[in-house]
């Protein structure tokens, strides 16, 4: 299965390594037409106001929204911001793939970034992981159909709704594979089971 990584900003290589560990084929997405040859998409970290400009200029908003109707999307850090319903910053145009509102750079400057242990309720069990937060966004509101998979300092930091998954931290920096596995294996399997059952 080919999984695309939006290659406008962020660390493409670390996400590629995670996908390869799961026997998934990573491919870089630089143009909207690239979405036609993948079965899932990662929106990696970066700078959300810059990502807004780059995505707008390339015509990604309509293309990703259409793609996300039937395919899983995983967003990390700024990727979560782009997937959110509202970013509380008028400079940022979001995709509205997750019914959450976020506050950007809630954890401060990059020098204050931290790695902390988290317990994640995912794939039917609770799992401990290390999570690296870098100028991380804070989820300040979750809609009724959003599942909270992990919290940090009382706020959700990993959420799932339908086929989509948003994280305020960077699992790829710690070699954590469970979120990529959940998004691109478990959720895809559930989607296929529903299609066959219909």
Residue positions per predicted region:
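A secondary-structure boundary/capping signal
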Residues: 8, 76-78, 98, 135, ...
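Redox-cofactor binding/interface segments in oxidoreductases and associated redox assembly factors
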Residues: 43, 75, 167
């Amino acid at each position: 299965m080919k999984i695309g990584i939006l290659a406008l900003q962020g660390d493409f290589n670390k996400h590629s390594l995670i996908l390869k560990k799961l026997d998934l084929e990573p491919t870089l997405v630089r143009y909207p037409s690239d979405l036609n040859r993948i079965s899932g998409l990662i929106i990696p970290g970066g700078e959300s106001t810059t990502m807004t400009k780059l995505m707008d200029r390339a015509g990604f908003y309509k293309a990703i929204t259409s793609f996300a109707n039937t395919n899983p999307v995983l967003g990390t850090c700024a990727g979560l911001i782009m997937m959110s319903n509202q970013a509380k910053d008028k400079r940022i145009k979001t995709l509205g793939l997750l019914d959450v509102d976020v506050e950007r750079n809630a954890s401060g400057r990059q020098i204050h970034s931290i790695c902390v242990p988290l317990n994640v309720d995912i794939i039917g069990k609770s799992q401990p992981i290390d999570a690296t937060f870098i100028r991380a966004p804070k989820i300040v509101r979750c809609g009724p159909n959003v599942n909270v998979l992990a919290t940090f300092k009382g706020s959700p930091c990993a959420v799932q709704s339908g086929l989509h998954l948003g994280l305020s931290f960077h699992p790829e920096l710690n070699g954590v594979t469970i979120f990529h596995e959940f998004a691109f294996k478990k959720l895809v399997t559930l989607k296929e089971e529903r299609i066959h059952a219909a």
